[in-house]
Swiss-Prot record:
InterPro entries: WRKY_dom (IPR003657), WRKY_dom_sf (IPR036576), WRKY_plant (IPR044810). Residues 104-172 bind DNA. Transcription factor. Interacts specifically with the W box (5'-(T)TGAC[CT]-3'), a frequently occurring elicitor-responsive cis-acting element. Pfam families: WRKY. Its main location: nucleus. GO terms for molecular function: DNA-binding transcription factor activity; transcription cis-regulatory region binding. It comes from Arabidopsis thaliana (Mouse-ear cress). The gene is WRKY38. Gene3D superfamilies: WRKY domain. Signal peptide: none annotated. This is Probable WRKY transcription factor 38. Keywords: DNA-binding, Nucleus, Transcription, Transcription regulation. The keyword Protein transport does not apply.
Length: 289
């Protein structure tokens, strides 16, 4: 297919819009990163213009058969250079024709296609090497698409990606690359969760429930100890009240020991002694054991 045909021009415009959309996506995912030479508004405007140009090209009146025949005749009439086969000249012409290029503040790792690096070399008057890539399906499907990547500016950083030719491999072969390009590694990391099933899930719920119960009981014990300390301070001069507190603390369940027939002091103790003075009732009623 002729590189300057309307169809190829439309493809170039769509690819450029796709590149701008990917850059805008990265900027929206990382708003604090360096904005680069183009603002978000400029990127959005470029996306709209590229798709508008593609639609305009595809909607234009196609060439007539006479125009196509005339174009083919003019190309065929030019003699090939000596010592160079026509097939080799056709491949070289395709490879030397710059399809389109993209300058971005970050390297374009995912552009919707799978690439394989086959070379790298230093460039004159440049501090950064240039990397060379070809389509991963170059041998399997005879896809001649290639690209070059190089950092052309340091401050602010600018990476130039130059594409040559167009992909002739099937679209479904690049679904993995498109799927990866549509995801953000940070989003994948944030969305990672562990799912538990069966006994593991029941054990996790039981562990959380037991931990909560122990925490509540610990808080109740602290409050109870604080109340007893305050009660001791108030009743420090009342020996009978002190004896009641000691009996309460020495009981296994935190309650008063039961009466016994042995005639112990706890059985003979008269609880009315605690309230022989009505003026002190307010002091005792504020404590609950």
């Amino acid at each position: 297919m002729e590189m300057n045909s309307p169809h190829e021009k439309a493809v170039q415009a769509i690819r450029y819009g796709h590149s701008c959309a990917m850059r805008l996506k990265r900027r929206l995912n990382h708003p604090m990163a360096d904005g680069g030479p183009l603002s978000s508004y400029d990127l959005a405007k470029s996306i709209v213009e590229s798709f508008s140009n593609a639609i305009s090209i595809l909607s234009a009146k196609p060439e007539t058969e006479d125009d196509q025949f005339s174009d083919l005749s003019s190309r065929d009439s030019s003699p090939p250079p000596q010592g160079s086969p026509s097939k080799k000249r056709k491949i070289d012409s395709t490879n030397s024709s710059e399809n389109w290029r993209d300058d971005s503040p970050d390297p374009i790792y995912y552009d919707g296609y799978l690439w394989r690096k086959y070379g790298q070399k230093s460039i004159k008057k440049s501090n950064h090497q240039r990397s060379y890539y070809r389509c991963s399906y170059n041998k399997d499907h005879n896809c001649e698409a290639r690209k070059h990547e190089q950092k052309i500016k340091d401050n602010p950083p600018v990476y130039r990606t130059t594409y040559f030719g167009h992909h002739t491999c099937k679209t479904e072969h690049n679904l993995d690359a498109i799927f990866i390009a549509g995801q953000d590694p940070l989003d994948d990391f944030k969305s990672t969760q562990m799912i538990r099933f069966g006994k593991d899930q029941d054990q996790e719920k039981e562990s959380r429930s037991n931990g909560f119960s122990l925490s509540v009981k610990h808080e109740e014990d602290i409050i109870k100890e604080q109340a007893i300390d305050q009660y001791r301070e108030i009743t420090s001069n009342d020996q009978d009240c002190q004896d009641v507190i000691e009996e309460y603390l020495s009981s296994p369940s935190g309650s008063y020991p039961p009466s016994s027939s042995s005639g112990s002091e706890s059985a003979d103790f008269n609880s009315d002694l605690l309230f022989d003075n009505p003026d002190s009732w307010d002091r005792y009623d504020q404590f609950y054991f």
